[in-house]
Amino acid sequence: RPSNVRIFARLRGVKNEKSKLNFALLPFSFCEYVLMKRGSFFSVKTASQCESLFGVTSSPDKYVIGSVMLETAAASADGTDSATVFIDLLTALKKLIYSGVNSYSLGLNFVYRLLVRGGHIAPGARDSDYNVDMDEQKDLPADRAKSLLKAYLSLFEKKYFIKLKTY
């Protein structure tokens, strides 16, 4: 069984409040899905929720940064240890929800660490404000964090040969 395969499945009939799988439709709901193949398509038979991070949707900035984290994690997981990327993503999203740290500072930290882990940049002394463990990330001035994040996202797009949809 191949390990680097993406399978796409559609959830139908889950918008109804009484649907058994309506929780799987919520943004930032991480679920384990059991798929059933019907002809050339897959259907979701059951789902069990691993983690609900719906709190990311509490503000527009958190939602955008959370979406950026998801998209960059998905793109970088193809070339690195995907389990480590997933654990880092969950940690970052929880920090985004429960800490008072600026969302752009957390997004910058996450994207920067993905680039370092992928071997695309070397850490330097000038990066000391965001080259820290996610739990140690402190607030950076919002304008600075935003402009640095934008620069690192541009670099991310070049290094991973993708065009991000969320930022």
Task: Annotate each language-model stretch with its function.
Residues 1-167:
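Non-catalytic alpha-helical scaffolds and adjoining flexible linkers that form interface surfaces
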